[in-house]
């Protein structure tokens, strides 16, 4: 299944706020109206919707998300927590959380178009897994910095998660550590996602 490129508001109206996909928010009460129309949800549908939230927020294909679930299952610790850490440490998500891109699709475009350096080298793979002490900077070109400046100027200036540090005037971000689960940028029940995939991994 390919990456979703359809109307974004349609998705947030059904699944709730997905800040990685779009900075728009569903209208107040729309979730309640949707629930009342659809009646009681089955357990399968509840798990499916949590999985869809994760997939659309991080901008993943079905195959990519399944791959991350399989990696998380083999790692030590809670599968759900490891899964969220893997997704949060992707380069496209780190750029988004730093405010250097307005959404994860916008961050992916920056990376694909070779505007981003990691530790002084161009990285053009959005799924690149960032590590503690990684230094993320804009390429030293006017166009690259201008694109990031637009995002920095329009970002809501929310508190940065404690695993990241931003130096906006240098167009630079630092990865201090692996993210703590309480700083994940999405309201999600990751256990339901793991349960959804339990028969496929």
From Swiss-Prot:
PANTHER family found in the cross-reference section: 30S 40S RIBOSOMAL PROTEIN, SMALL RIBOSOMAL SUBUNIT PROTEIN US4M
Primary location group: plastid
Gene3D superfamilies listed in its UniProt record: Ribosomal Protein S4 Delta 41, Chain A, domain 1 (1.10.1050.10), RNA-binding S4 domain (3.10.290.10)
InterPro entries, A to Z: Ribosomal_uS4, Ribosomal_uS4_bac-type, Ribosomal_uS4_CS, Ribosomal_uS4_N, S4_RNA-bd, S4_RNA-bd_sf
Function: One of the primary rRNA binding proteins, it binds directly to 16S rRNA where it nucleates assembly of the body of the 30S subunit. With S5 and S12 plays an important role in translational accuracy.
Example GO BP: translation
PROSITE patterns xrefs: RIBOSOMAL_S4, S4
GO molecular function, one term: structural constituent of ribosome
Protein name (database record): Small ribosomal subunit protein uS4c
